[in-house]
Amino acid sequence: MAHPSLTDLIAAERDTLATGPVAVVLVEDDVEIATTLRHHQQIGFDHVIALMPEEFTLPADVEQTVLRATYDVYGPQAMETAVNLVNDAVPGQWVFYCFNAEYLFFPFCETRNVKEMLAFHTEERRHAMLAYVIDLYADDLSQYPDAVSLDHAHLDRSGYYALARADLERGGEPKERQLDFFGGLRWRFEEHVPTARRKIDRIPLFRAKKGLRLREDHTFSDEEYNTYACPWHHNITAAICSFRTAKALKTNPGSRYDIHTFKWHNSAPFEWHSRQLLDLGLMEPGQWF
């Protein structure tokens, strides 16, 4: 169902959105829109919201099953504004957010759905989940100049690292159970990426509550939401497998002509399976065996 704006969608669908986990997809361009929306339906989100320009089209089957709203996706803080509006509308509900050509993976997602995972995560008294944005890229940029190919997607199997996250209010002391994570294309081609956008950590899954606010760096106003685990043991982490950085590097005139391939000696074909991500240490099951 299509709505003229996100506020109209929320007003019309508020009761519906309260019945199950919600995925919010911000559609920045016309690349892999349908596959992104279908993927998040298939892994178990009850409601998928597509925020997109009016001129973009969807296949009929997707158009009938997602909640579409016309939205200024290029406006300042477009994602933060949208997520905060949805947060205020569905207190207590789990919400996920991503961009088009991004795909959420979590441990055992081939045999367990997102509602099962979130139920377990809730039982562990967690209200948010850390994910790493894992860059995907086509192996042959001459054949796929926008760097996007589902059938020939590759990822970096190493080259990831973490640094302590400084608490500026405490003189730069490390924040408890918070780290800044780096790697992938934003690390290998960092000269083309603004410093503030080099992190690959995101808190894309969270439980909505009154007054909560998503910030521009993909962290929340409640610091506990930004932690990678509870104090007593490790928790589930997820991965967002994303073509977004590769697309940007091959679209931006400042980097387009400097990059002829994204492949290097640590590239590996992406298998589109959670087992590969677990084996590479790019997410973990915590206590969810």
Which residues does each PLM region occupy?
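Active-site-proximal specificity loops/subdomain of glycosyltransferases
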Residues: 3, 51-98, 103-119
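Short, acidic, metal-binding catalytic loop of nucleotide-sugar glycosyltransferases
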Residues: 38-48
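Short, high-confidence coil segments that cap the C-terminus of an alpha-helix
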Residues: 45, 91-92, 123-128
